[in-house]
From Swiss-Prot:
This is Probable GTP-binding protein EngB. Mg(2+) binds at S43, T65. Keywords: Cell cycle, Cell division, GTP-binding, Magnesium, Metal-binding, Nucleotide-binding, Septation. GTP binds at residues 36-43, 63-67, 81-84, 148-151, 180-182. InterPro entries: G_ENGB_dom (IPR030393), GTP-bd (IPR006073), GTP-bd_ribosome_bio_YsxC (IPR019987), P-loop_NTPase (IPR027417), Small_GTP-bd (IPR005225). Residues 28-199 form the EngB-type G domain. The keyword Secreted does not apply. GO terms for biological process: division septum assembly. It comes from the Bacteria. Signal peptide: none annotated. One of its GO terms (cellular component) is cytosol. PANTHER family: ENGB-TYPE G DOMAIN-CONTAINING PROTEIN (PTHR11649:SF13), MSS1/TRME-RELATED GTP-BINDING PROTEIN (PTHR11649).
Length: 199
């Protein structure tokens, strides 16, 4: 079954931005959280999956997303864009505040079905990437690792880069790993199929 048969992915809008759980939507719609370091391509991933150019704002300035942004998709599903982590120019106080906000959402939100953890296919995972993956495994939160910016690497080297990332993350073979490009749309179908299977 394709995502188009299940929901109209083009019928999407930003619903609200929240700093804590008192602002979360109060219903039982399933949610998919998207986490990753600043400038990993979360906004481009959201826009590509939803077939929209500017629904999620892409920015040349890392660390721009400072709240949990909830996107309503056809009144059947929500994407939750969490603040990008690991950006040095953001103060330690702000990073600590974001970390607490992200942790509160990931640990306490009953609507959460799966976290899409985005990493950059071109580079080894950072310590922040590793900590996020370990955090999700510790709390037994389902996770899909999506390696972005695949178009920046020759296709013949994808497997090598994937192996490096998996080794660094101590990747659980039962989890899903998807190589993705918002430019070529590689990984688009696999990403939707994997997300929908978790709902």
């Amino acid at each position: 079954m394709t995502e188009e048969q299940v929901l109209n992915t083009h019928n999407a809008e930003i619903l609200l931005s929240a700093a804590n759980k008192s602002h979360y939507p109060q219903d039982d719609l399933p949610e998919v959280a998207l986490a990753g370091r600043s400038n990993v391509g979360k906004s481009s991933f959201i826009n590509t999956l939803l077939g929209r150019k500017n629904l999620a704002r892409t920015s040349g300035k890392p660390g721009k997303t400072q709240l949990l942004n909830f996107y309503n998709i056809d009144d059947k599903l929500r994407f939750v864009d969490v603040p990008g982590y690991g950006y040095a120019r953001v103060s330690k106080k702000a990073r600590a505040k974001w970390g607490k906000m992200i942790e509160e959402y990931l640990v306490t939100r009953d609507n959460l079905r799966v976290v899409v953890s985005l990493v950059d296919l071109r580079h080894e995972p950072t310590q922040d990437d590793i900590q996020m993956y370990e955090f999700l495994k510790y709390y037994e939160i389902p996770v899909i690792v999506v390696a972005t910016k695949a178009d920046k690497i020759p296709r013949g080297k994808w497997n090598k880069h994937e192996s490096i990332i998996k080794k660094k993350l101590n990747f659980d073979k039962n989890d899903h790993f998807i190589v993705f490009s918002s430019v070529t749309r590689d990984g688009y179908d696999e990403a939707w199929d994997t997300i929908l299977a978790e709902l």
